[in-house]
Structure formats: structure tokens, C-alpha cells
């Protein structure tokens, strides 16, 4: 009789243990869904990123949007969700964000579209997505609004696919290193600065700012142990082939190819560009030595860049793959930040007026030059005039939305700018998180320079290039760090 009672007790104990274990799974279960979609535009198409109009009639590589849905389920608390969408675009205009959300609502009303976090890889060989920058021909070229519609419908469908594919999974993270970005602003003995300025002249003094050589990676697995997605944070825009007149995803394309060959043909790869408004893959010095090494390896610059990132990711993977976590709590905060806009001075206003007069004179002599001068006339100089008139009534402010996502002991934070690297480093240094992933261009862009850069001048730091100045940059850092540290 005693044996029977002991057996009953043992069986009951097993059921209790299983119940407790299953409750833990339900309470903190991590569910992951992924998808990838081709967002290559129909040709011919105008290209975004340069000051002049370029019309592409050739596709060198496809463009992609990669989606990862992460959900932390709990039977005692509200489920937390974040939907990351990384796009081979120059920026993410507000019109595109709203259009994608609207399309997702139509086909998947169960999805809370406020959880969508989009970012651009900042390729300069992708379609124009921002209105008012170029004199795009009305006939024979893909129109911006048509691409918006095409992109939004395809991306929304891919979001639904990722949402519907959610299954239990695991995640881990790690840190590697590779020199990808190079600070592209040279300073001189007269205290001036220049983007892509010469460094092999006696007047050259130093490279202006910092570089961030961290390669931070998130790895996502399914229950079978297959790697199904990665998120790779590199503080360098994808602009190695930026001057070409073709469709090209830049270094992310060969990197994705290498990663899919190494891990999984269906691997989703989130390309997260870190704070790198003053960075570029272009070398500022040491070009001959770099070229020699590439020739010895028999590869081009795109392969060299992707090779370095792959090496950092693989090295990180080998170290952290045994630390997969299935029960990671997620906190997703969406915050509105109000920043002071940069004030247009009288001298800046007068300078822009003079430049506009020069451009108008050029156009009278050669009306066809509008294709090359439209952006300078309408946006670059023209917006300065509009801002000067507008600020007479009220001090201008810039409102923007940022996302802060805590996953375990790491955090991801976004901003809409081409944010100079020193701001991103400050966020990482002051954050209480084990690792802090900073994602720029989670919005429409414009440079956000440091005070040193503004004093040095030139493109990326002058009034024409910026809506928000260094005081706004410091406030962005302070508020982002506060949001992060409140989660820890």
C-alpha cells in the first residue's frame, strides 16, 4: 500500500513540476517571426542621395526589406511586441512610415502598427523616396508616389508573413570589431573643415571626429536550432558605390549573400546603421596600402567591407551561440522628443539669397540645367529662406518619435537623423545596458552635427544640411539615455 501511495505521490510531483515549467514557458515565452521581401523598383528610376539627378537603367543587385517580429508572451502581463523593418533605402520619410502602417492595418488588423520600427541602410543607389528634391521627369520614369505604393504594399505583406510565422525561439547577442566606417571630415590649420577634404597637403591637421568600430549583433534561432535572423549594427552608411547610376544595395548585398551561404539560405538580415552622420566607407588616407591588400586578395571594396563584417559576426557567433535565451522579457517604449531647431542667422539667410540668385542666373542661360540644380535651388538653399521667415514668429522646434527596446540586458534605441558618431558613442557610454544598439535613420534624416563640426563648417554641418544643431543633439542624447536607464 505504501508503494502505491509513493508512486501516486511521485506522479503528482511530476505533474506539478511540469505545470510549473510550462507556466514559465507561457509567462516568458519568446516568439520570433521573419521574412524578406524584394523592394527593387521598376526601371528607369531616379536615384536618391546626391545633389544632382541620376536616372538608373540597370539593376546591379536587388534591394531588400528584412523583417523580424519579436514577441515576449506572458499570461500575467501584456505581451510586448516589436517589429523591425530594415530597408535598402536612403531614408524613411514619414509618408512611407504612415503608408506601411496603413497597409498593415488593412491586411492584418490584429497587428498594433505602433510597434513597427523602420530604418534605412542609407544607400545612395536606391530609388528617390523623398518629395521635392529632384526635377524627376513626369513620363518614362518611376514616380515617387508610385514607388511608395509599391513599397508599402510589398512590405506590409511581408510584415504579415513574419507575424503569421511567429514560433517559439531564442536570442542572444554579442560584440565584435571591424573597421568599416571612416570619419570623412578633414580639418585644417585655419580651423576649417571639409567633408572628403584632402589629407595629403601641408594644411591638413587632423580627422575631425571619432569612429565607432564596434560590430554588435543579435542572433535569432528557431526551436530546431536553425539561425533564422540576425541584426547587425555597423556605424557606417552603405555608400561604397554611392556615385554609380545603378540600383545597388551596396555592401549589405554581398554581406547577406555570405551570411546566407554560411548559416541559412532564408536568413533575414536586419541592417542597422549606427550613429554615423560623419562616417563613410571611403578611405581618407592609406588608400594605396588598402588597394594593394585588396589586389592580393583579388576582391573589390564591397567584398572587402562585407568580408570584415562577416568575420566579426562569425567570431561573435562562435562565442555566444551557447548562450541562447528562450525566456527573455521585452520592454518596448515609444517616446516623443521635442528638440530645438537650429536658428538661421542673418548672414546665413543673406548667403542663401545670393546663392539662389546665382542659380537663377545659370538657369536663364541654360534652362536644362534644372535637372542638376533643382535640389540646390528648391531644397538646399530654398529651405533656408523659408526657415528664416518662419522663425520670425516662433522659435522653431523639431518633434520626433524614438523607440527604446529592452531585450534582456541589452537595449536598442532609434533616432531619425544622420547622427554624428560622437552622439552615438555618448549614448553607449552612458547607458546602463550591457550593450546599446544605436540605430540612425529610423525616419526622414538630415544631419545632426557636433559643435566642433559646426565651427569647422562645410557640407553636413552648415545650416543647409541641418534642421537640428548641437544643442538639440545633446538633448537627444540626454533624453535617450534617460529613457534607457529607466528600464534598468
What are these regions (language model features)?
Residues 10-20:
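Bacterial N-terminal signal peptides
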Residues 1-6:
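N-terminal secretory signal peptides that target proteins for export/translocation
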Residues 22-27:
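Sec/Tat signal peptide C-region and signal peptidase I cleavage site
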Residues 28-268, 272-275, 279-304, 310, ...:
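Conserved beta-alpha junction segments in alpha/beta enzyme cores
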Residues 7-10, 245:
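A compositional/structural signature marking long, glycine- and acidic/polar-rich segments
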